A protein has these predicted regions:
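ATP-binding/phosphotransfer module of carbohydrate and carboxylate kinases, centering on a glycine-rich
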Residues: 1-3, 12-18, 34-43, 57-67, ...
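Active-site glycine-centered loops adjacent to acidic/histidine catalytic or metal-binding residues
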Residues: 50, 76, 247
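Generic enzyme active-site microenvironment
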Residues: 48, 56
Length: 252
């Protein structure tokens, strides 16, 4: 074994191998992850943001093959993003670039785990999609979602997805709202980066893939870029193995 690749939630410093202050892992603040792995295993360790690494794998071997500029997003428990230009991760000056999940799209919105208000993660990640569905059910709306979950408190995105495929109107409403939130967010991404392709991984991405075409059409309204509606929105090749592929890509 010549090296170990590690995908970690960010923000982090990939050059130093230090995890800085991930909102969902507060116990890892300023944690020297690469140094600890090297101390234990005696080989070089490379650490990067999980979305950066997965995006690199998709650009090299997956759904981003053939494109120069790849925007990658993991839509799941949180929302993580990565930017890959010509098979190279864009890290920014300190390594903390591409934290697109914490881009605010509603300054009066719910508070995110990062402390800001109205981040796209606070609105369209899996747990927050479920919370919006729970609010509708708590208001008394009848839905198959409640039957599948057993109670309002137990609602998860898998229940919403199943109800959607069974034709439930509340599930469709919740997911259509999510699609609109994501479209507004992606319009900003396009205006800043103008990617050649946008690749999505994670359980929420699979759930939302039925809306990709309408989201792409919506980009014509939410971006000033004249070719926004031409940019493909595609599912990642590696799915739940994106982290493994990303770790391998770091060591290539």
């Amino acid at each position: 074994m010549t090296g170990i690749g590690i995908c970690s939630p960010g923000p982090l410093d990939p050059r130093a191998g230090v995890v800085l202050n991930p909102p969902n892992l507060p116990c890892w603040r300023n944690f020297p992850l690469a140094a600890e792995i090297e101390r234990v295993y005696g080989v070089r360790a490379l650490v990067d943001n999980d979305a950066n690494a997965a995006g690199l794998a998709e650009a090299i071997w997956g759904a981003g093959v053939g494109y120069h500029n790849v925007f990658f997003a993991i839509l799941g428990t949180g929302i993580g993003t990565g930017i890959v230009f010509d098979r190279k991760i864009y890290h920014g000056r300190t390594g903390s670039a591409a934290e697109g999940g914490h881009m605010t799209i509603d300054y009066r919105g719910p508070r995110c785990g990062c402390g800001k208000l109205g981040c796209i993660e606070a609105l369209a990640s899996g747990p927050n999609i479920a919370r919006r569905a729970q609010a509708k059910l708590a208001a008394g709306d009848a839905s198959r979602i409640r039957e599948l979950a057993g109670s309002v408190e137990a609602v998860r995105t898998e229940h919403i997805g199943q109800a959607f495929h069974e034709g439930d109107s509340i599930a469709r409403e919740v997911l259509a709202e999510t699609a609109m939130l994501l479209t507004v967010w992606l319009g900003n991404i396009v205006d800043v980066l103008e990617p050649d392709v946008m690749v999505f991984g994670g359980g929420v991405a699979e759930l939302m893939s039925s809306f990709f075409e309408s989201m792409r059409a919506g980009l014509e309204q939410w971006s000033i870029n004249q070719r926004a509606g031409e940019i493909p929105l595609v599912l990642a090749r590696y799915g739940n193995e994106a982290g493994i592929a990303g770790a391998a890509a770091l060591c290539r």
